[in-house]
């Protein structure tokens, strides 16, 4: 059993304020660098079909935000890279580990994307290690993100294989049911898992899943994440690709997991479910609100930039943050 170290999740933690050193939260710098590029926020929308399509990816890149295009339109990936590069934008795509993906990666030499994410549910695998090595051999200048993992051993192995960043999180997301279907994962202790993995990491960690509030972004950074991948908070916007559905006169958008039957089109090895989210406004409004909330967090930390969040004290409050208000 691994409970020798503290096990906690986002709602169990409160960060402790420090003396504020800026006149206004607007002075706080929320930017973060990953590889050779700097982005406005340390967040990335989940590379899922109901979160982004090519239009959303383009909007994010133009706005100075990091994005990772999903891997479920395989034939469209090379034209997508070209279209992004033609506009002077970064190309960031996902690959799997099936045999044909090796040929695909080799075809990218002529127009290599800046970022490739190797994206499988259980990323601590020989198949992922060999794909990392293949990408690094074929496209040495491409930044490789590999995942998903949930242990320090996995982080070290993927880094040693050549990964430039690792993605941590096994099934903590709102539409992921891996924890229920298999009994495995970081659901319920995702924040502690990120901390455990970050202590072993020499390269950036991307915390993936379980984010329910903007404050969770600051908490992720406190416990070692360089970037935070977010699904449900980015789903359901006007620009989101999910179908809009009307129920009793109210607008909802569908949001489903990457291993759900809705995405797979077949009921086989299903580890994702579909939910309806109340339709939100524009994606940019959420990004702006996230930026302002993170600026406030930096000011509470007594800092001026994102990295200052890494040094604040915290308490473990065991689920009492909402004071019994379960509606959150």
Swiss-Prot record:
Which residue positions are annotated as catalytic? 176 (thioimidate intermediate)
Reaction it catalyzes = IMP + NH4(+) + NADP(+) = GMP + NADPH + 2 H(+)
Stored InterPro entries: Aldolase_TIM, GMP_reductase, GuaC_type_2, IMP_DH/GMP_Rdtase_CS, IMP_DH_GMPRt
Task: Check the record and name the SUPFAM superfamilies matching this protein.
Answer: Inosine monophosphate dehydrogenase (IMPDH) (SSF51412)
Q: Which HAMAP family match?
A: GMP_reduct_type2
GO biological processes: purine nucleotide metabolic process
EC number(s) per UniProt? 1.7.1.7
Query: What role does it play?
Result: Catalyzes the irreversible NADPH-dependent deamination of GMP to IMP. It functions in the conversion of nucleobase, nucleoside and nucleotide derivatives of G to A nucleotides, and in maintaining the intracellular balance of A and G nucleotides.
Can you tell me which residues bind NADP(+)? 205-228
Q: Which family does it belong to?
A: Belongs to the IMPDH/GMPR family. GuaC type 2 subfamily.
- Keyword annotations of the record: NADP, Oxidoreductase
Please tell me the species this chain comes from: Streptococcus pneumoniae serotype 19F (strain G54)
The main enzyme category here is oxidoreductase
May I have one GO cellular component term? GMP reductase complex
Task: State the Gene Ontology terms under molecular function.
Answer: GMP reductase activity
Q: What is this protein called?
A: GMP reductase
- Tell me which SMART domains the record gives: IMPDH
